[in-house]
Amino acid sequence: MLATTTPTIEGKRITKYYGIVTGETIIGANLFRDFFASIRDIVGGRSGSYEEVLRQAKDTALREMQDQAALLGANAVVGVDLDYETVGDSGSMLMVTASGTAVRIED
């Protein structure tokens, strides 16, 4: 399923709007705390393992959003937005939310 941050898809006509769809995922407390601890340990470098966890969280949120759109009969999602927020009592978890508008585009 096509998902794009733009409000339209060049060369395609939107034939039906189904409404807003979302997908969410949360990275657990220990992982999130360890993520920030690793940042302190890295000077001028990148932590590939934590980047991979964040990438997986983003991909999960996008997949859930697309699955919700498919259940409505959509074949694309436009206006996609990704948000990252800390949640929990001490802000020890990270929530990734994907949202957009489910649409049907001409084939």
Swiss-Prot record:
It holds the Pfam family YbjQ_1. InterPro entries: UPF0145_dom_sf, UPF0145_YbjQ-like. HAMAP family: UPF0145. PANTHER family: UPF0145 PROTEIN YBJQ. Belongs to the UPF0145 family. This is UPF0145 protein BVU_2335.
